[in-house]
């Protein structure tokens, strides 16, 4: 990977520019580490898909997701963080300084690495989801559920994530309909029982979301569902040239005010596979036990949703971002390899 490598060696490079990455950038920049932030394929991360954030400390009237991200970037830049468009495709972490190969072929060298690449919510591929994501279509009930007080809403999925979404939404919505493509849930028994026993939650079995209706001005106004007695109706829809009704497929349009995807998240850790960084079965970055963001490789730290399969909140991502920066600063001090006010010593000083 070293061919064509940039000779500059950064103290800290942060991969990802969501809340976790920005928080890490602010803290690292204030520590005079002059961090480089590689923004990734979706600058700003998942929060840019949220129109209103009402549960982030310090904004009693709420704040737009994009505005919160932009403010965070400006704050980090004010303290000296350097932002660059770029996506990491490969990482060499066996030697120091670490090397990160970008999609454009350039290579970034860094002494410490903070991975804040987030986790991308799975979408279902329904017509209209691209236009209406963030405008009534959501992947986070905790973030957006309160906006649907009094609405009828759909939850797509059949696992624990979907049950958690449905149970949270039932606090606000008049009705919650769980749409699942099979006739039994994949969720744990206890989560399935809680959802089944809730008076506001009902189920549409052997059904899938085909199309979402509405506009960015009005939000979601309805949805087209397809169902089949044997389940997985869209597969049969794609495979059959016959009329839908003749193939046993039933199509129905329902009026709803919101649609929530509960089909899981995929951590953005592909570039770490085979590097020695430990990944959970789910793909999430594994950190060491205890209150730390350190990983199995010294000098590599994790922050945000990429290492958090449970909370997935903007405020917790900001917290782990600051922790990662503080951990990275302490580690660099212990190695005496900061390129700022401290003299470089040790084998990496000549890198």
Feature locations, PLM:
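Glycine/small-residue-rich loop that forms an oxyanion/phosphate-binding "nest" at active or ligand-binding sites
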Residues: 83-103, 107-143
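Beta1-alpha1 glycine-rich phosphate/pyrophosphate-binding loop at the start
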Residues: 3-6, 10-79, 151, 163-189, ...
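Phosphate-coordination loops involved in phosphoryl transfer and adenosine-cofactor binding
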Residues: 9-11, 85-86, 149-151, 206, ...
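A Rossmann-like FAD-binding core segment of flavoenzymes
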Residues: 76-95, 99-102, 107-110, 171-289, ...
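A conserved FAD-binding loop/helix module that cradles the flavin
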Residues: 163-165, 297, 306-351
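Residue-level detector of alpha-helix initiation sites
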Residues: 18-19, 42, 119-121, 160-161, ...
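FAD-site-proximal beta/loop scaffold in flavoenzymes
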Residues: 2-3, 7-9, 125, 131-147, ...
């Amino acid at each position: 990977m070293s061919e064509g490598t940039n000779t500059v060696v950064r103290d800290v490079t942060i991969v990802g520019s969501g809340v976790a990455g920005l928080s890490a950038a602010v803290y690292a920049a204030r520590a005079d580490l002059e961090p480089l932030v590689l923004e990734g394929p979706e600058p700003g991360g998942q929060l840019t898909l949220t129109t209103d954030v009402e549960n982030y400390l310090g904004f009693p009237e709420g704040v737009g997701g994009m505005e919160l991200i932009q403010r965070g970037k400006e704050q980090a830049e004010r303290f000296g963080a350097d932002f660059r468009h770029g996506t990491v495709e490969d990482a060499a972490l066996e030697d120091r300084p670490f090397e990160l190969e970008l999609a454009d072929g350039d290579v970034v060298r860094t002494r410490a690495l903070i991975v804040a690449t987030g986790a991308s919510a799975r979408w279902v591929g329904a017509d209209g989801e691209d236009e209406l994501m963030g405008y009534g279509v959501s992947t986070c009930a905790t973030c957006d559920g309160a906006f649907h007080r009094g609405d009828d809403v759909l939850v797509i999925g059949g696992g624990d994530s979907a049950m958690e979404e449905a149970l949270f939404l039932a606090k606000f919505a008049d009705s919650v309909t769980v749409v699942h493509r099979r006739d039994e849930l994949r969720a744990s028994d206890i989560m399935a029982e809680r959802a089944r026993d809730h008076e506001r939650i009902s189920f549409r079995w052997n059904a899938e979301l085909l199309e979402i209706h509405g506009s960015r001005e009005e939000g979601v106004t309805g949805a087209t569902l397809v169902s089949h007695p044997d389940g997985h109706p869209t597969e049969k829809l794609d495979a059959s040239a016959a009329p839908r009704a003749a193939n046993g497929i039933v199509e129905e349009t329902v009026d709803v005010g919101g649609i929530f995807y509960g089909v899981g998240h995929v951590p953005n850790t592909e570039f770490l596979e085979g590097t020695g960084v430990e990944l959970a079965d789910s793909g999430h970055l594994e950190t060491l036990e205890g209150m730390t963001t350190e990983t199995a490789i010294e000098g590599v730290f994790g922050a945000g949703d990429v290492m958090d399969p449970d909370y997935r909140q903007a405020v917790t991502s900001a917290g782990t971002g600051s922790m990662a920066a503080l951990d990275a600063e302490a580690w660099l001090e212990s190695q005496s390899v900061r390129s700022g006010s401290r003299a470089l010593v040790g084998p990496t000083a000549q890198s």
